[in-house]
Amino acid sequence: MPLGSDAAAAARNFATKLFNATKFALMNGAGVAALPNREELSDADRWILDRAEEIRAKVDAYLDDYQFAKANELLYHFTWDELCDWYLEIAKTQIPRDGMSEQGRNTQIVLGRVLDVVLRLLHPTMPFVTEAVSYTHLTLPTTPY
């Protein structure tokens, strides 16, 4: 299947978006840790965790049926439209710059967890990108699946 310059540019833009989202998260203290109790999370934190779980289940089903295009499209839209365009913007207001509140720490944990899920789900089709993004910062290369 030939790839045109538009498809290559779209793939580059997505990889850049993923890299920048991860960079933002790590610069703001996000990391993979045990999730706090659900009652302690903000509405936005609960929403993105629920959506990430829905996406994970759908992507798993698509991959089990060898429907790679559907899995990738779902991940693309979740990552770009929901995680980056919505949740990251909300997270910017929940993670304070001048001190750490409990809600700010919870948002860091949720952001780290959701990024870890996204990188794991993207890994089968974008292994070089996901390893480059997570190798030095997150747990993808060293944790079992």
In which residue ranges do the predicted regions lie?
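Long, non-coiled-coil amphipathic alpha-helical linker/lever segments
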Residues: 52-70
